[in-house]
Every structure is written in C-alpha cells, then in structure tokens.
Amino acid sequence: TYGTNASVGGTLGVTGVTDLAGNAGPTAGTGITTGTGTIFASTVTHAGGLWHTSILIDLTGLASSGSGDIIGKAGTASSNIGTTTVALNGTILGGKLTCMETPAGGDPDIDLWYADESTGAEDAAITSLSNQVQMLNSGDLAAGSVLGIPVPPAASKFMYLVTGAATNADYTAGKILIEFFGYDA
C-alpha cells in the first residue's frame, strides 16, 4: 500500500487484471437503486486530458408513466441517475446513449434530461423541477441503436430518464449505456 496517491515515472507495465474500483462515477438516487432487478453501475476514467464517464443501467424493476414523467421505482423520490462535476468528470463536451437491450414493459421512448434538484420522483413531470433541460430526445429505443447526446449535462445538475410517450407499466427488460466525454479545462 502506497497511501492515497502513487506516482510512477516512466512506463508502467501491469501483468494481470488492473482493478480501478476507486474510479466510481455518478451515484444514482434511491428511486433508481432500489428497483427490483435494477442494475446501476458507473465509472470515470481520466487519462491525459481526456475524461470518460460511463453509466450502465438495467431498467428492469423501474416504472414509466405519462409522457414527460420521470422514470424510476414506482412512487419513489430521488429517481435521478446522478450528477456530474468538473472535478469528477472534466468539462463535458458531448456524449452518447447506446441501447444494448430493447426496453420492454415500460415505455421504450426514453429521453435524457437534467434539473437542479435530486429529489424528482417517478411519475412526476420533469417540468415540475427547476431549470430542467432536455439533453436527448431519443424516440423509441431498440437494441443496437446509438444516439449522440447533443446537449451535454451542465455541471452539478441531476440527470433523469424521462418517458417520451405514455406507457404506465414496469420495465421487464431494457439495458442502456450512457457515456460522456470531457476534457481538462
């Protein structure tokens, strides 16, 4: 153990697995993390001047409702998927959403938004939150679709998955990967 920081001059060679468990990314609220069968994992890497943030979500156990409403565990507050900061994610230039499994049960039209508050609840209108901004209007997601995120998240805002159409049901399938690319400013 070398303490909290180690510096190596020259080239570092590693044989075997490199575990970067300390590279945790955004932390989701309980409206995402308490869904039955829901998976949320995130990581951040910083190499040179490039930052890469990844958020992996299995939607199983979350719920969708009316158009423009927040997705999360039914009736649960804090249904955000985390926040980004310049210190943790760099200055974000852009991103992409990859659908790895077509959403089923709940609505497949899943948009990405951010707002000031972390407390947004499932089934609440995203427009009920302060300073909300739509980052991505995806249309119906299908396995294999990759969509650019034209509006990157503003620093220290909370991100939400939001229904683009109305299907009041629980998700039984659906896996998405959200990635952001940032730089040292």
PLM region spans:
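A short beta-strand-loop element at or near the start of a globular domain
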Residues: 49-88
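Noncatalytic modules at the cell exterior or secretory-pathway interfaces
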Residues: 149-170
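Intrinsic low-complexity, repeat-rich intrinsically disordered segments enriched
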Residues: 1-49, 120
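C-terminal interaction-tip segments
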Residues: 44-48, 165-185
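Beta-rich globular "head" domains
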Residues: 77-114, 177-182
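Short structured motifs
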Residues: 38-39, 78-82, 96, 142-146
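Residues at beta-strand starts and edge strands
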Residues: 49-53, 91-93, 108, 157, ...
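Terminal beta-strand-rich extracellular "head" domains
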Residues: 104-148
